[in-house]
Amino acid sequence: MKEGIHPNYTEVTVKCLCGNTFQTRSTKPEISTEICSACHPFFTGKQKLIDTAGRVERFKRRYGM
Protein backbone atom coordinates (compact mmCIF):
# COMPACT_ATOMS: atom_id res chain seq x y z
CA MET A 1 0.00 0.00 0.00
CA LYS A 2 1.16 3.51 -0.71
CA GLU A 3 1.67 5.76 2.26
CA GLY A 4 0.04 9.16 2.53
CA ILE A 5 -2.81 8.60 0.06
CA HIS A 6 -5.42 7.15 2.42
CA PRO A 7 -7.81 9.43 4.34
CA ASN A 8 -7.80 9.43 8.14
CA TYR A 9 -10.27 6.93 9.57
CA THR A 10 -11.32 8.34 12.93
CA GLU A 11 -14.14 8.03 15.44
CA VAL A 12 -16.99 10.47 14.75
CA THR A 13 -20.36 11.34 16.25
CA VAL A 14 -23.49 10.73 14.19
CA LYS A 15 -26.30 13.20 14.97
CA CYS A 16 -29.93 12.49 14.11
CA LEU A 17 -32.69 15.10 13.76
CA CYS A 18 -34.54 13.43 16.64
CA GLY A 19 -31.65 14.33 18.97
CA ASN A 20 -30.09 10.88 19.20
CA THR A 21 -26.30 10.65 18.88
CA PHE A 22 -23.97 7.68 18.58
CA GLN A 23 -20.34 6.96 17.80
CA THR A 24 -18.95 5.24 14.72
CA ARG A 25 -15.84 5.43 12.57
CA SER A 26 -15.62 7.31 9.29
CA THR A 27 -13.37 9.35 7.05
CA LYS A 28 -15.78 12.29 7.38
CA PRO A 29 -15.37 14.64 10.36
CA GLU A 30 -19.11 14.80 11.18
CA ILE A 31 -22.23 12.92 10.07
CA SER A 32 -25.87 14.03 10.36
CA THR A 33 -28.90 11.95 9.43
CA GLU A 34 -32.65 12.44 9.26
CA ILE A 35 -33.72 9.03 10.59
CA CYS A 36 -31.90 6.64 12.93
CA SER A 37 -32.79 3.41 14.71
CA ALA A 38 -34.17 5.41 17.66
CA CYS A 39 -36.84 7.16 15.56
CA HIS A 40 -37.38 4.88 12.52
CA PRO A 41 -40.90 3.37 12.46
CA PHE A 42 -39.56 -0.15 11.82
CA PHE A 43 -37.56 -0.14 15.06
CA THR A 44 -39.99 1.87 17.23
CA GLY A 45 -43.19 0.12 16.16
CA LYS A 46 -44.91 3.50 15.78
CA GLN A 47 -46.18 4.75 12.46
CA LYS A 48 -45.33 8.30 11.44
CA LEU A 49 -47.96 10.25 9.57
CA ILE A 50 -46.73 11.68 6.32
CA ASP A 51 -48.69 14.62 4.94
CA THR A 52 -49.57 13.47 1.44
CA ALA A 53 -52.97 15.16 1.28
CA GLY A 54 -51.45 18.27 -0.28
CA ARG A 55 -49.71 16.22 -2.93
CA VAL A 56 -52.87 14.27 -3.77
CA GLU A 57 -54.93 17.44 -4.08
CA ARG A 58 -52.30 19.05 -6.29
CA PHE A 59 -52.28 15.92 -8.51
CA LYS A 60 -56.08 15.99 -8.81
CA ARG A 61 -56.11 19.69 -9.70
CA ARG A 62 -53.33 19.27 -12.23
CA TYR A 63 -54.96 16.38 -14.07
CA GLY A 64 -58.61 17.44 -13.63
CA MET A 65 -59.74 14.56 -11.48
Curated annotation (Swiss-Prot):
InterPro entries: Ribosomal_bL28/bL31-like_sf (IPR034704), Ribosomal_bL31 (IPR002150), Ribosomal_bL31_A (IPR027491), Ribosomal_bL31_sf (IPR042105)
Co-factor remark: Binds 1 zinc ion per subunit.
Gene: rpmE
Cystine connections: none
GO biological process entries: translation
PROSITE patterns referenced in this protein's UniProt entry, alphabetically: RIBOSOMAL_L31
Organism per entry: Geotalea uraniireducens (strain Rf4) (Geobacter uraniireducens)
Protein name from the UniProt record: Large ribosomal subunit protein bL31
Quaternary organization: Part of the 50S ribosomal subunit.
